[in-house]
């Protein structure tokens, strides 16, 4: 930042002899520059503290560049640029920058935007967007940048982050999730081994594009994944640029195979393969064991792996086959003598006859009509082309098969996942000394991604601000629409002209194609050519810079022809894997696609279609951008070259992004969705209702006004100080005509208040529910008690009624029996009274009454037993035991009672046939009953019941018949 000069420094310079004093002028300038430099150095010391480039003032390319350099020198490699994260590749391992502890810290924080810039900030924000279910729910993280900027490493770290944070607390569920996450992570080394290679600009350059969808269930746990690949650079199998290498898997095999594997695959340690250049360079990616373990975890067993490596070894031997020029054009070219062995080994590994292999490589089959077949020997260059075509076709099919197998093992069923987070890793922008169709397609993909970024964050935001009435100073940005139209536009573009040449199937040299391009596309400013180059070429002005493309062989590469006889050769192979890769059912399709009169889908058309489907997915998701920056071309650690970084910053539109994001509102929600989601925040007295009933009753204008008033009510509840008189124009929120524009901080405030309101209302609902449940349980308990009381009362009444009926019957029967017994007893008593009384009184008079009383008093308190046999009639005992007699005896005085006892005992003693046990405790008769033979112990405890201690046993005596029945009844 420059400062105005002070008054003291604004002096007129002195003049000597009519000339200005240059020395004083120099001192004057040096002082002002010194002040400016001092201020600049102070600011420069603080530049590394700026986490967000939008806070740098002024926002210019120079200040942004200085800020990134200061942070890079301080060991800080991530910086926010508004809605984008800028990642500068350190080119060295950084301690604990990607550890699991750091991942958990970013995941557990309450405010990810408040943390230090990191790729985990972007990952966590996307993860929380899925949790909040704000439309669009699905997320995409687009990792872009030049080759070697760190895109592949960033994608790998993002996958590890999601595998770490999606773990479940449940042991069983967590074990299943970890198994799925392990398979998803194992797909990385396999895909990198077969799809990455060492180039001039990157040791681990992705030679294919991939879009990985991490599938999440309702609990936001990874249940599976799917991989989509784009445009594998299969030409690298047979053609490697100087100082570059083939795919990693070939070097892993050659360096990591065991002795037995080398013998089986015919890979001697000192072998020299023309398709395996620069194998002496040892790279971190040359780890064969990691690749084999990952393949095993993905369901590719050991025999299948062995089969794959045999085929790859066969391709290496196939590349060593060299042909000699034929002396006679009618004779096919023969392989050189020293390459005959390579042909035999290649045929053996591919399990095809060596004669068939050499024949199909050197002789072309021409079909004329349906049955006419001609064979024509090929020239040496054609033989080499057919050999390379065979290798490229096998490798491309093998790569597609690997992707299919990986998807079968990691992809979840559609019913098991609800949302996804996509990770896009495509080739970076490429510009080499010689560029052809591959670089044209790669740069076309980067142009489409840049257009998506521009349309999403720059153009769409400014257009939407203007449409919604947001006060906004428009910013000029670099629009690449003209370049995209040049490549894919309709009706005339570079791709359309290339496809037309392929459809015409005519021999057209590169110079003629160059003239067609210049004449047809001269109106577009993005195309040109190098007039000083002898080779036909054209130059395209991409967003990242100008690139010169060579036209030679471009049309032929676009056709990507595969001779049908080569497909037939592979279909005849005895190898099981090759039979899967080239099924016989495709024979007719192959003939139709390679017929001389018809051309199949071109490479450009196929790539354009797959890219369009990818862009549709990106447009349907919420995108997040990570811009990877390569600080130097040499990939040296902690080396920051401003010129190279500046080119990348300008190319990807970082400065324009910062300008818009600094004063912009990245989150836009319609009034209807806003009120629907945040209506719970409004105070109770506002009585807010949902806006959906207004659709049928009111017009759109009245509905919008009502929604706007409700929206203001909600915002006033969140920001009461900032919101005055329904005017919401501040740094946090702005209300347009149909949408509300929010910053991330405002969304966090709204979500926090919404969570508090939902928690409060949930607690209220819980309290109401609990009280309702308690009242319901009380009512149910009371009702159950009432029912139980009624049932018990009914049962009791029924039982009492039954008992009363039974008692009445028993009472009636007993009364009849009693009357009958009393009558019988009275009749018998009348007959035997005279004999008994005479005997009794005679014995009683023999001893005085006093002796009787004394004997009574001298009786011990124990049982007195005397034996007697009843002889005087069957009713004698019954008479004594009859109720009337008992009553009579009990009611008599003491003397008569004693007399009666003695009379009975004497009579029984005289008969000497029955034993009677008498229990006496006090005056009066306690018990007198006949008992069965054997000892019976009587207890003296008094019972309130009469005759409660009488043993009801059967009397084994001469009492039988009716008297026995009467005795039992009496007992």
From Swiss-Prot:
Please list the residue ranges annotated as the IQ domain.
758-787, 780-809
> Would you tell me the Gene Ontology cellular component terms?
actin cytoskeleton; cytoplasm; membrane; mitochondrial outer membrane; mitochondrion; myosin complex
Primary place of residence? mitochondrion
**Residues at which ATP binds:** 145-152
Q: Where is this region: Disordered?
A: 1-25
Presence of the UniProt keyword Cell membrane in the record? no
Where in or outside the cell?
Mitochondrion outer membrane; Cytoplasm, Cytoskeleton
Residues in Myosin motor domain copies: 48-755
InterPro entries documented for this protein: IQ_motif_EF-hand-BS, Kinesin_motor_dom_sf, Myosin_head_motor_dom-like, MYSc_Myo19, P-loop_NTPase
Which membrane topology describes this protein?
Peripheral membrane protein
Report the transmembrane regions from the record.
none
MyMOMA region, as annotated region? 826-971
Q: Which cysteines are joined by disulfide bonds?
A: none
**GO annotation (BP), single:** regulation of cytokinesis
Keywords assigned by UniProt, alphabetized: Actin-binding, ATP-binding, Cytoplasm, Cytoskeleton, Membrane, Mitochondrion, Mitochondrion outer membrane, Motor protein, Myosin, Nucleotide-binding, Repeat
Reading the lineage from the top rank, the first entry is: Eukaryota
Q: Which GO terms describe its molecular function?
A: actin binding; actin filament binding; ATP binding; ATP hydrolysis activity; microfilament motor activity
Q: Where is the stretch described as Actin-binding? A: 611-633
Query: What note about domains is in the entry?
Result: The MyMOMA (MYO19-specific mitochondrial outer membrane-association) region mediates association with the mitochondrion outer membrane via electrostatic interaction.
Its annotated function is as follows: Actin-based motor molecule with ATPase activity that localizes to the mitochondrion outer membrane. Motor protein that moves towards the plus-end of actin filaments. Required for mitochondrial inheritance during mitosis. May be involved in mitochondrial transport or positioning.
Q: Which family does it belong to?
A: Belongs to the TRAFAC class myosin-kinesin ATPase superfamily. Myosin family.
Under PANTHER family, the record lists: MYOSIN, UNCONVENTIONAL MYOSIN-XIX
Q: How does it assemble?
A: Myosin is a hexamer of 2 heavy chains and 4 light chains.
The protein's name is Unconventional myosin-XIX
Query: In which organism is this protein found?
Result: Xenopus laevis (African clawed frog)
Question: What does the record give as the organism's lineage?
Answer: Eukaryota, Metazoa, Chordata, Craniata, Vertebrata
């Amino acid at each position: 930042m420059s400062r105005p000069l002070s008054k003291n420094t604004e002096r007129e310079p002195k003049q000597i002899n009519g000339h200005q004093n240059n020395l004083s002028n120099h001192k004057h300038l040096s002082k002002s520059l010194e002040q400016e430099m001092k201020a600049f150095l102070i600011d420069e010391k603080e530049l590394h503290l700026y986490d967000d480039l939008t806070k740098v003032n002024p926002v210019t390319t120079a200040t942004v560049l200085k800020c990134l350099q200061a942070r890079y020198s301080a060991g800080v490699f991530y910086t926010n640029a508004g809605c984008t994260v800028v990642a500068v590749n350190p080119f060295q391992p950084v301690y604990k920058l990607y550890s699991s502890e750091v991942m958990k810290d970013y995941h557990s924080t309450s405010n990810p935007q408040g943390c230090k810039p990191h790729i985990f900030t972007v990952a966590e924000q996307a993860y929380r967007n899925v949790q909040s279910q704000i439309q669009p729910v699905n997320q995409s993280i687009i990792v872009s940048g030049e080759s070697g900027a760190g895109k592949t490493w960033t994608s790998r770290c993002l996958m590890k982050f999601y595998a770490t944070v999606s773990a479940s607390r449940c042991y069983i569920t967590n074990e299943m999730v970890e198994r799925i996450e392990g398979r998803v992570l194992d797909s990385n080394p396999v895909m990198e081994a077969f799809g990455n290679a060492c180039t001039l600009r990157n040791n681990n350059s992705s030679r294919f594009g991939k879009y990985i969808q991490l599938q999440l269930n309702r609990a936001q746990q990874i249940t599976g994944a799917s991989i989509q690949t784009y445009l594998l650079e299969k030409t690298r199998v047979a053609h490697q640029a100087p100082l570059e290498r083939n795919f990693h898997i070939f070097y892993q095999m050659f360096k990591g195979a065991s002795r037995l594997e080398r013998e089986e695959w015919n890979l001697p340690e000192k072998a020299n393969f023309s398709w395996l250049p620069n194998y002496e360079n040892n790279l971190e990616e040359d780890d064969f064991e990691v690749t084999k373990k990952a393949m095993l975890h993905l369901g590719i067993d050991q025999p299948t792996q062995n089969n794959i490596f045999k085929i790859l070894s066969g391709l290496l031997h196939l590349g060593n086959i060299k042909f000699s020029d034929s002396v006679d054009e009618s004779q096919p070219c023969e392989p050189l003598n020293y390459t005959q062995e390579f042909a035999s080994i290649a045929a053996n590994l591919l399990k095809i006859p060596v004669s068939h292999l050499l024949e199909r490589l050197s002789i072309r089959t021409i079909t004329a009509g349906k049955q006419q077949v001609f064979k024509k020997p090929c020239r040496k260059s054609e033989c080499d082309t057919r050999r390379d075509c065979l290798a490229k076709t096998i490798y491309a099919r093998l790569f597609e098969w690997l992707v299919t197998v990986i998807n079968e093992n990691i992809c979840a069923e559609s019913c098991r996942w609800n949302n996804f987070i996509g990770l896009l890793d495509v080739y970076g922008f490429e510009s080499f000394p010689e560029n052809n169709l591959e670089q044209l397609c790669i740069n076309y993909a980067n142009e489409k991604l840049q257009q998506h970024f521009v349309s999403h964050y720059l153009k769409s935001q400014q257009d939407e601000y203007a449409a919604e009435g947001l006060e906004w100073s428009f910013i000029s940005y670099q629009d690449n629409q003209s370049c995209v139209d040049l490549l894919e536009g309709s009706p005339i573009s570079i791709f359309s002209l290339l496809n037309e040449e392929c459809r015409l199937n005519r021999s057209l040299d590169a110079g003629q194609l160059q003239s067609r391009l210049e004449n047809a596309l001269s109106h577009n400013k993005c195309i040109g050519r190098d007039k000083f180059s002898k080779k036909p070429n054209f130059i395209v002005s991409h967003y990242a810079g100008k690139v010169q493309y060579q036209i030679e062989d471009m049309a032929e590469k676009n056709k990507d022809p595969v001779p049908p006889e080569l497909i037939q050769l592979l279909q005849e192979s005895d190898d099981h894997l090759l039979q899967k890769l080239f099924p016989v059912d495709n024979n007719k399709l192959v003939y139709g696609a390679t017929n001389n009169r018809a051309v199949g889908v071109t490479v450009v058309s196929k790539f354009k279609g797959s890219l369009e489907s990818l862009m549709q997915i990106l447009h349907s998701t919420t995108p997040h951008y990570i811009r990877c920056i390569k600080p130097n071309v040499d990939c040296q650690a902690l080396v920051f070259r401003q010129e190279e970084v500046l080119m990348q910053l300008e190319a990807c539109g970082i400065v324009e992004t910062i300008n818009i994001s600094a004063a912009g509102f990245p989150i836009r929600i319609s009034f209807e969705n806003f009120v629907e989601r945040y209506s719970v925040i409004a105070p109770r007295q506002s009585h807010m209702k949902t806006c959906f009933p207004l659709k049928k009753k009111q017009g759109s204008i009245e509905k919008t006004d009502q929604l706007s008033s409700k929206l203001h009510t909600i915002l006033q509840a969140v920001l009461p100080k900032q919101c005055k008189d329904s005017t919401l124009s501040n740094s946090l929120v702005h209300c347009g005509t149909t949408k509300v524009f929010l910053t991330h901080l405002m969304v966090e405030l709204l979500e926090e208040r919404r969570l508090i309101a939902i928690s409060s209302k949930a607690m209220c609902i819980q309290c109401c529910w609990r009280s309702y449940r308690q009242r319901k349980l009380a009512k149910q308990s009371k009702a159950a008690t009432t029912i139980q009381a009624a049932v018990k009362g009914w049962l009791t009444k029924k039982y009492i009624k039954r008992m009363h009926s039974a008692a009445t019957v028993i009472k009636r029967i007993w009364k009849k029996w009693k009357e009958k017994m009393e009558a019988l007893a009275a009749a018998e008593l009348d007959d035997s009274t005279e004999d008994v009384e005479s005997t009794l009184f005679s014995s009683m008079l023999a001893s005085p009454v006093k002796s009787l009383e004394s004997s009574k008093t001298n009786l011990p308190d124990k049982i007195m037993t005397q034996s007697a046999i009843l002889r005087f009639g069957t009713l004698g005992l019954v008479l004594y035991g009859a109720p009337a007699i008992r009553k009579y005896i009990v009611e008599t005085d003491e003397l008569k009672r004693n007399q009666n006892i003695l009379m009975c005992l004497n009579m029984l003693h005289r008969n000497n046939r029955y034993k009677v046990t008498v229990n006496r405790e006090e005056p009066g008769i306690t018990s007198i009953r006949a008992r069965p033979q054997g000892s019976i112990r009587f207890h003296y405890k008094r019972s309130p019941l009469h005759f409660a201690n009488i043993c009801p046993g059967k009397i084994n005596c001469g009492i039988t018949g009716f008297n026995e029945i009467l005795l039992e009844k009496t007992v």
